[in-house]
Amino acid sequence: MNFRQLIFKILYNENNMKKFLLKPKKSLGQNFILSSEITKKIVALAGSLENFNVIEIGPGYGALTREILVHNPKSLLSIEKDRDLVKHHDQLLNEHQGKYRIIEADALHIIEEELIERPVKVIANLPYNISVALFLKWLDSIKFFTSLTLMFQKEVADRITARPNSKDYGPLSVLSQLLCDIKKEFDIEPKEFFPRPKIHSSVITVNPLPTPKFVVNLETLIKLIRAVFAQRRKMLRNSLQNITNHAETVLENAKLSGNERPENLTIEQFCLLANNVECLLCNKMY
């Protein structure tokens, strides 16, 4: 065991955390990583960091932060909402002056482009209570990022990476995979965290595409997938009635029978449907 591993074992030990550190705040979705092997695996998935600025969300006591800094990024910016935890980063700030900074802020309300320069990689153990909202926020400006290596609740990771004809496939799957190449890398058991959550976690890698996989008006697509997945057990000819009075025409032009359910459609088929709805709205079909 080298010195760094020894320090990690002492600092991020469940018993020591219970005795000496602040009680995690459930309201902030705090679950701290206990395993140095896991932090190593997460950071390794992000690839070389030497020429990249890195953003970390919810650094907690700095387990993942320390591993990121070992890989010598151009700079590291951590965003932490908990003021009490920000104070625990004084030593890291002193050790990595000019390279590391931490901001007390709500990650949902920051504008990354104003805080850090490209190229940017995100590496984060996301707070459970904001993970989906934060990921959707990033999808809205996805081209700003080179890559994202993210830990989610397993159920959220399953929704993001789900394929057609599965129970987890939905709006989050369609939108994410339209804009990015996404891969689920590995699952993590509750015992690897303090406090121990009741659910498993998963790490995914997200690589933004230069352009979406298919040409589509994103606003129309989002309205479409929200409408049809809100009634996911209904056939398309019925669920489409919520967004157009010409469902049969839209289905015919998209070469669909209307008997399909939302979970049966590929991303390409959703984009084709959305484009036909858009044409109707613009009166281009007649």
From Swiss-Prot:
One MF term in the entry's GO annotations: 16S rRNA (adenine(1518)-N(6)/adenine(1519)-N(6))-dimethyltransferase activity
Any transmembrane segments, and where?
A: none
Q: Which domain of life is it from?
A: Bacteria
One GO CC term on file: cytoplasm
| UniProt-listed Enzyme Commission number(s) | 2.1.1.182
Query: CDD domains of this UniProt entry?
Result: AdoMet_MTases (cd02440)
List the subcellular locations: Cytoplasm
What's the catalysed reaction?
adenosine(1518)/adenosine(1519) in 16S rRNA + 4 S-adenosyl-L-methionine = N(6)-dimethyladenosine(1518)/N(6)-dimethyladenosine(1519) in 16S rRNA + 4 S-adenosyl-L-homocysteine + 4 H(+)
Q: Which PROSITE patterns match?
A: RRNA_A_DIMETH (PS01131), SAM_RNA_A_N6_MT (PS51689)
Sorted alphabetically, the keyword list is:
Cytoplasm, Methyltransferase, RNA-binding, rRNA processing, S-adenosyl-L-methionine, Transferase
Q: Which SUPFAM superfamilies did the record assign?
A: S-adenosyl-L-methionine-dependent methyltransferases (SSF53335)
UniProt-listed Pfam families: RrnaAD
- Annotated positions binding S-adenosyl-L-methionine: N31, I33, G58, E80, D106, N125
Q: Which family does it belong to?
A: Belongs to the class I-like SAM-binding methyltransferase superfamily. rRNA adenine N(6)-methyltransferase family. RsmA subfamily.
Q: What is this protein called?
A: Ribosomal RNA small subunit methyltransferase A
Organism listed in the record: Wolbachia pipientis wMel
